[in-house]
Amino acid sequence: MPTIQQLIRSERSKLKKKTKSPALKQCPQRRGVCTRVYTTTPKKPNSALRKVARVRLTSGFEVTAYIPGIGHNLQEHSVVLIRGGRVKDLPGVRYHIIRGTLDAQGVKDRKQGRSKYGTKRPKKA
C-alpha cells in the first residue's frame, strides 16, 4: 500500500488492455495473400471440417483466418480482406475472411443474412 507522498511522486500506472487481434495493427481490416487453404477439425465436443486459410498480411504478419459460409473459391495466391473475430472451437483462429471483396466471392444462393456473406440481393422473378 503506497503512502500519499509516493502517490504524489508517481501516479498509479494504468492497466494496458491487450488487443485480441494484434495483426490488424489497430486497423478495422487488413489485406493479405493466401499462402495455404485447408480444412481443420474443431475442439471437442464438436465435429466438422472447418475451412481456414493461412494469410500473409500487408502488416507483415502471417495469420490463420476462417472462411465463413458454404463453399468458397479461395486458393493459394488469392488476395483477401480479413477482419477480427475468433472462431470459438478452432484454437489459434482469431480472424475472419470477408466474403464478397477482392478475390473472395460471396456465398451462392444465400437468401438470409446476405450482408455477412457478401451476397447480392436476388432478382425478382
UniProtKB/Swiss-Prot annotation:
Q: Which InterPro entries match?
A: NA-bd_OB-fold, Ribosomal_uS12, Ribosomal_uS12_bac
Q: Where is this region: Disordered?
A: 9-28, 104-125
3-methylthioaspartic acid: modified positions: 89
Which is one GO molecular function term here? structural constituent of ribosome
GO CC annotations on file: small ribosomal subunit
Entry's family note:
Belongs to the universal ribosomal protein uS12 family.
Oligomer status and interactors: Part of the 30S ribosomal subunit. Contacts proteins S8 and S17. May interact with IF1 in the 30S initiation complex.
Query: Mind telling me what this protein is named?
Result: Small ribosomal subunit protein uS12
Source organism per entry reads Rippkaea orientalis (strain PCC 8801 / RF-1) (Cyanothece sp. (strain PCC 8801))
